Protein backbone atom coordinates (compact mmCIF):
# COMPACT_ATOMS: atom_id res chain seq x y z
CA UNK A 1 0.00 0.00 0.00
CA UNK A 2 1.33 3.44 -0.94
CA UNK A 3 2.04 5.92 1.82
CA UNK A 4 -0.26 8.92 2.04
CA UNK A 5 0.94 11.92 0.08
CA UNK A 6 2.31 14.81 2.14
CA UNK A 7 -0.61 17.14 2.85
CA UNK A 8 1.85 19.95 3.45
CA UNK A 9 5.51 19.84 2.51
CA UNK A 10 7.88 22.41 4.01
CA UNK A 11 11.12 22.69 2.06
CA UNK A 12 13.98 24.61 3.62
CA UNK A 13 16.26 25.40 0.71
CA UNK A 14 14.34 25.85 -2.54
CA UNK A 15 17.27 25.28 -4.88
CA UNK A 16 18.14 22.41 -7.19
CA UNK A 17 17.43 19.54 -4.78
CA UNK A 18 14.64 20.97 -2.64
CA UNK A 19 12.94 22.55 -5.62
CA UNK A 20 13.17 19.38 -7.70
CA UNK A 21 11.71 17.29 -4.85
CA UNK A 22 8.74 19.64 -4.60
CA UNK A 23 8.24 19.72 -8.38
CA UNK A 24 8.46 15.93 -8.67
CA UNK A 25 5.80 15.38 -6.01
CA UNK A 26 3.60 18.05 -7.58
CA UNK A 27 4.08 16.48 -11.01
CA UNK A 28 3.04 13.11 -9.58
CA UNK A 29 0.02 14.65 -7.85
CA UNK A 30 1.43 13.51 -4.52
CA UNK A 31 1.51 16.70 -2.46
CA UNK A 32 -1.09 19.16 -1.22
CA UNK A 33 0.75 22.42 -0.66
CA UNK A 34 4.43 23.34 -0.59
CA UNK A 35 5.93 25.97 1.68
CA UNK A 36 9.38 27.20 0.69
CA UNK A 37 11.90 28.67 3.12
CA UNK A 38 15.13 30.29 2.04
CA UNK A 39 17.80 32.84 2.79
CA UNK A 40 17.09 35.17 -0.12
CA UNK A 41 13.86 36.68 -1.35
CA UNK A 42 14.93 36.67 -5.03
CA UNK A 43 15.26 32.89 -5.22
CA UNK A 44 12.01 32.40 -3.31
CA UNK A 45 10.18 34.73 -5.68
CA UNK A 46 11.53 32.75 -8.60
CA UNK A 47 10.36 29.52 -6.97
CA UNK A 48 6.89 31.04 -6.65
CA UNK A 49 6.86 32.15 -10.30
CA UNK A 50 7.88 28.66 -11.40
CA UNK A 51 5.12 27.11 -9.23
CA UNK A 52 7.69 25.11 -7.28
CA UNK A 53 6.22 26.39 -4.02
CA UNK A 54 2.88 27.87 -3.00
CA UNK A 55 4.01 30.09 -0.12
CA UNK A 56 7.41 31.54 0.70
CA UNK A 57 9.27 32.78 3.75
CA UNK A 58 12.75 34.03 4.31
CA UNK A 59 14.31 32.62 7.46
CA UNK A 60 13.50 35.73 9.48
CA UNK A 61 9.78 35.78 8.57
CA UNK A 62 8.19 33.42 11.10
CA UNK A 63 8.19 30.34 8.92
CA UNK A 64 8.23 27.96 11.89
CA UNK A 65 4.49 28.59 12.33
CA UNK A 66 4.01 26.42 9.22
CA UNK A 67 5.57 23.36 10.88
CA UNK A 68 2.83 22.28 13.29
CA UNK A 69 0.59 20.78 10.59
CA UNK A 70 3.30 19.82 8.10
CA UNK A 71 3.46 16.19 6.99
CA UNK A 72 7.11 16.42 5.96
CA UNK A 73 9.91 18.92 6.50
CA UNK A 74 12.79 18.52 4.06
CA UNK A 75 16.05 20.30 4.85
CA UNK A 76 17.80 20.83 1.51
CA UNK A 77 20.58 23.19 2.56
CA UNK A 78 24.37 22.97 2.88
CA UNK A 79 25.15 20.47 5.63
CA UNK A 80 26.88 23.14 7.71
CA UNK A 81 23.48 24.77 8.27
CA UNK A 82 21.79 21.65 9.62
CA UNK A 83 22.58 22.05 13.35
CA UNK A 84 20.99 25.51 13.51
CA UNK A 85 18.00 24.36 11.46
CA UNK A 86 17.36 21.34 13.67
CA UNK A 87 17.40 23.62 16.70
CA UNK A 88 15.03 26.05 14.99
CA UNK A 89 12.41 23.48 13.98
CA UNK A 90 12.40 21.12 16.97
CA UNK A 91 10.07 23.14 19.26
CA UNK A 92 7.51 23.76 16.50
CA UNK A 93 7.02 20.37 14.84
CA UNK A 94 3.65 18.65 15.01
CA UNK A 95 3.32 15.23 16.69
CA UNK A 96 3.22 13.43 13.35
CA UNK A 97 5.60 15.55 11.32
CA UNK A 98 8.44 13.65 9.65
CA UNK A 99 11.78 15.37 9.18
CA UNK A 100 14.29 14.47 6.50
CA UNK A 101 17.31 16.04 4.86
CA UNK A 102 19.11 15.84 1.53
CA UNK A 103 22.68 16.32 2.72
CA UNK A 104 25.66 14.73 0.99
CA UNK A 105 27.22 13.65 4.30
CA UNK A 106 25.36 11.74 6.94
CA UNK A 107 27.38 11.12 10.11
CA UNK A 108 27.68 14.84 10.90
CA UNK A 109 24.00 15.48 10.16
CA UNK A 110 22.93 12.59 12.39
CA UNK A 111 25.20 13.80 15.20
CA UNK A 112 23.58 17.24 15.00
CA UNK A 113 20.10 15.71 15.00
CA UNK A 114 20.88 13.67 18.10
CA UNK A 115 21.85 16.78 20.06
CA UNK A 116 18.91 18.96 19.01
CA UNK A 117 15.80 17.04 17.91
CA UNK A 118 14.98 15.39 21.23
CA UNK A 119 11.67 13.52 21.11
CA UNK A 120 11.43 14.16 17.36
CA UNK A 121 14.51 12.02 16.64
CA UNK A 122 12.54 8.80 15.84
CA UNK A 123 10.75 10.74 13.10
CA UNK A 124 14.00 11.92 11.48
CA UNK A 125 14.95 9.98 8.34
CA UNK A 126 18.36 11.02 6.96
CA UNK A 127 18.50 10.89 3.17
CA UNK A 128 20.80 11.68 0.28
CA UNK A 129 19.49 11.86 -3.29
CA UNK A 130 22.51 11.15 -5.49
CA UNK A 131 21.54 13.49 -8.27
CA UNK A 132 22.58 16.98 -9.07
CA UNK A 133 24.16 19.46 -11.39
CA UNK A 134 26.72 22.22 -11.28
CA UNK A 135 23.72 24.56 -11.57
CA UNK A 136 21.94 25.81 -8.46
CA UNK A 137 18.91 27.81 -7.39
CA UNK A 138 15.22 27.48 -8.14
CA UNK A 139 15.78 27.98 -11.86
CA UNK A 140 17.77 24.73 -11.94
CA UNK A 141 14.98 22.63 -10.39
CA UNK A 142 13.45 19.87 -12.50
CA UNK A 143 10.66 17.39 -11.83
CA UNK A 144 12.71 14.71 -13.61
CA UNK A 145 15.97 15.19 -11.68
CA UNK A 146 15.60 12.06 -9.52
CA UNK A 147 14.22 9.66 -12.14
CA UNK A 148 16.35 6.55 -12.18
CA UNK A 149 18.77 8.02 -9.63
CA UNK A 150 19.92 6.46 -6.38
CA UNK A 151 18.50 7.85 -3.15
CA UNK A 152 20.24 6.60 -0.01
CA UNK A 153 18.44 6.52 3.35
CA UNK A 154 20.56 6.12 6.49
CA UNK A 155 18.04 5.60 9.30
CA UNK A 156 19.14 5.55 12.92
CA UNK A 157 18.54 2.46 15.09
CA UNK A 158 15.72 4.33 16.82
CA UNK A 159 14.12 5.69 13.64
CA UNK A 160 10.43 4.78 13.36
CA UNK A 161 10.12 2.14 10.58
CA UNK A 162 6.87 3.78 9.49
CA UNK A 163 8.66 7.09 8.94
CA UNK A 164 11.35 5.32 6.91
CA UNK A 165 8.71 3.67 4.73
CA UNK A 166 6.92 6.95 4.09
CA UNK A 167 10.12 8.74 3.11
CA UNK A 168 11.06 5.79 0.90
CA UNK A 169 7.70 5.98 -0.82
CA UNK A 170 7.93 9.74 -1.41
CA UNK A 171 11.35 9.41 -3.03
CA UNK A 172 10.06 6.52 -5.12
CA UNK A 173 7.22 8.75 -6.28
CA UNK A 174 9.90 11.22 -7.40
CA UNK A 175 11.41 8.48 -9.56
CA UNK A 176 14.26 7.60 -7.22
CA UNK A 177 15.72 4.15 -6.58
CA UNK A 178 15.92 3.93 -2.80
CA UNK A 179 18.72 2.10 -0.97
CA UNK A 180 19.41 1.83 2.77
CA UNK A 181 22.97 2.12 4.11
CA UNK A 182 24.62 2.91 7.40
CA UNK A 183 25.76 6.51 7.72
CA UNK A 184 29.37 5.36 8.04
CA UNK A 185 29.26 3.30 4.85
CA UNK A 186 27.50 6.09 2.98
CA UNK A 187 30.16 8.63 3.89
CA UNK A 188 33.00 6.25 2.97
CA UNK A 189 31.52 5.46 -0.44
CA UNK A 190 30.53 9.01 -1.32
CA UNK A 191 33.93 10.37 -0.31
CA UNK A 192 35.58 8.34 -3.07
CA UNK A 193 33.00 8.64 -5.84
CA UNK A 194 31.64 12.16 -5.27
CA UNK A 195 33.54 14.28 -2.78
CA UNK A 196 37.02 13.47 -4.13
CA UNK A 197 36.08 14.14 -7.80
CA UNK A 198 34.64 17.52 -6.84
CA UNK A 199 37.76 18.38 -4.88
CA UNK A 200 40.01 17.42 -7.81
CA UNK A 201 37.99 19.55 -10.22
CA UNK A 202 38.19 22.57 -7.91
CA UNK A 203 41.92 21.99 -7.40
CA UNK A 204 42.82 21.68 -11.09
CA UNK A 205 40.89 24.76 -12.16
CA UNK A 206 42.28 26.69 -9.19
CA UNK A 207 45.86 25.72 -10.06
CA UNK A 208 45.50 26.63 -13.74
CA UNK A 209 43.75 29.91 -12.93
CA UNK A 210 46.63 30.91 -10.64
CA UNK A 211 49.18 30.70 -13.46
CA UNK A 212 50.31 34.04 -14.85
CA UNK A 213 49.56 32.85 -18.39
CA UNK A 214 46.24 31.21 -17.54
CA UNK A 215 44.54 32.81 -20.55
CA UNK A 216 46.78 30.80 -22.89
CA UNK A 217 45.65 27.55 -21.26
CA UNK A 218 41.96 28.46 -21.51
CA UNK A 219 42.45 29.35 -25.18
CA UNK A 220 43.64 25.89 -26.17
CA UNK A 221 41.58 23.85 -23.69
CA UNK A 222 39.07 21.46 -25.21
CA UNK A 223 36.49 18.95 -24.13
CA UNK A 224 38.92 17.03 -21.92
CA UNK A 225 39.38 19.90 -19.49
CA UNK A 226 35.75 20.95 -19.82
CA UNK A 227 34.39 17.51 -18.97
CA UNK A 228 36.91 16.78 -16.20
CA UNK A 229 36.30 20.10 -14.43
CA UNK A 230 32.55 20.61 -14.91
CA UNK A 231 32.13 20.05 -11.17
CA UNK A 232 34.23 23.12 -10.37
CA UNK A 233 31.13 25.23 -11.03
CA UNK A 234 29.25 23.52 -8.21
CA UNK A 235 27.92 25.55 -5.27
CA UNK A 236 31.04 26.58 -3.29
CA UNK A 237 29.38 26.87 0.13
CA UNK A 238 27.71 23.50 -0.19
CA UNK A 239 30.93 21.76 -1.23
CA UNK A 240 33.00 23.50 1.41
CA UNK A 241 30.64 22.11 4.05
CA UNK A 242 30.66 18.62 2.52
CA UNK A 243 34.46 18.44 2.39
CA UNK A 244 34.86 19.72 5.93
CA UNK A 245 32.19 17.36 7.27
CA UNK A 246 33.78 14.31 5.64
CA UNK A 247 37.38 15.46 6.05
CA UNK A 248 38.76 12.32 7.72
CA UNK A 249 37.54 9.97 5.02
CA UNK A 250 38.33 12.45 2.25
CA UNK A 251 41.92 12.82 3.44
CA UNK A 252 42.31 9.04 3.32
CA UNK A 253 41.04 9.01 -0.26
CA UNK A 254 43.37 11.90 -1.15
CA UNK A 255 46.29 9.88 0.22
CA UNK A 256 45.31 6.88 -1.93
CA UNK A 257 45.02 9.15 -4.97
CA UNK A 258 48.45 10.65 -4.29
CA UNK A 259 49.90 7.13 -4.20
CA UNK A 260 48.41 6.45 -7.61
CA UNK A 261 49.87 9.71 -8.93
CA UNK A 262 53.25 8.75 -7.49
CA UNK A 263 53.09 5.43 -9.34
CA UNK A 264 52.27 7.23 -12.56
CA UNK A 265 55.10 9.70 -11.96
CA UNK A 266 57.50 6.78 -11.53
CA UNK A 267 56.31 5.26 -14.82
CA UNK A 268 56.94 8.56 -16.59
CA UNK A 269 60.34 9.01 -14.97
CA UNK A 270 61.44 5.53 -16.02
CA UNK A 271 59.86 5.79 -19.48
CA UNK A 272 57.80 2.69 -18.70
CA UNK A 273 55.21 3.07 -21.42
CA UNK A 274 54.07 -0.52 -21.10
CA UNK A 275 53.08 -0.05 -17.46
CA UNK A 276 51.38 3.25 -18.24
CA UNK A 277 49.44 1.74 -21.11
CA UNK A 278 48.39 -1.20 -18.96
CA UNK A 279 47.10 1.20 -16.28
CA UNK A 280 45.11 3.13 -18.87
CA UNK A 281 43.66 -0.10 -20.27
CA UNK A 282 42.62 -1.34 -16.82
CA UNK A 283 41.03 2.01 -16.03
CA UNK A 284 39.15 2.09 -19.32
CA UNK A 285 37.88 -1.45 -18.81
CA UNK A 286 36.77 -0.64 -15.27
CA UNK A 287 34.82 2.39 -16.45
CA UNK A 288 33.24 0.43 -19.30
CA UNK A 289 32.13 -2.25 -16.84
CA UNK A 290 30.64 0.42 -14.60
CA UNK A 291 28.85 2.17 -17.50
CA UNK A 292 28.10 -0.53 -20.09
CA UNK A 293 26.95 0.79 -23.45
CA UNK A 294 28.64 4.15 -23.03
CA UNK A 295 31.79 5.29 -24.73
CA UNK A 296 33.86 8.10 -23.31
CA UNK A 297 35.07 11.03 -25.36
CA UNK A 298 38.53 11.32 -23.91
CA UNK A 299 40.27 10.90 -27.26
CA UNK A 300 38.62 13.95 -28.86
CA UNK A 301 41.26 16.47 -27.83
Question: What residue ranges belong to the model's regions?
Answer:
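Internal alpha-helical scaffold of NAD(P)-dependent oxidoreductase catalytic cores
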Residues: 143-230
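Residues at the starts of beta-strands that form the adenosine-phosphate
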Residues: 8, 33-34, 123, 150, ...
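Interdomain hinge/lid region at the active-site interface
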Residues: 214-283
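Long, positively charged, glycine-interspersed low-complexity recognition regions
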Residues: 288-301
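Rossmann-like NAD(P)-binding element
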Residues: 61-93, 97-98
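Rossmann-like NAD(P)(H) cofactor-binding subdomain of soluble oxidoreductases
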Residues: 85-139
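Glycine-rich, N-terminal phosphate-binding loop of Rossmann-like dinucleotide-binding domains
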Residues: 76-78, 103, 155
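NAD(P)+-binding Rossmann beta1-loop-alpha1 motif at the extreme N-terminus of oxidoreductases
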Residues: 1-67
